[in-house]
UniProtKB/Swiss-Prot annotation:
Record protein name field: PI-stichotoxin-She2b
Main location: secreted
UniProt site positions, description: Reactive bond for trypsin: 13-14
Keywords, comma-separated and alphabetical: Aspartic protease inhibitor, Disulfide bond, Nematocyst, Protease inhibitor, Secreted, Serine protease inhibitor
Location of this chain's protein in the cell: Secreted; Nematocyst
Task of the protein: Inhibitor of serine, cysteine, and aspartic proteinases.
Amino acid sequence: SFCLEPKRVGRCKGYFPRFYFDSKTGKCTPFIYGGCGGNGNNFETLHQCRAICRA
């Protein structure tokens, strides 16, 4: 599942507030996404992260 993938901020220099599921804590956590080169563990809202990863 992509919920278990590590957080990836990406290689671009954008500033997009997002959430990822932290498998160590079992919680959805905010981070800043650069805009490209990320992975599936990247959600626009806390609700979306919690719904998909069951946090």
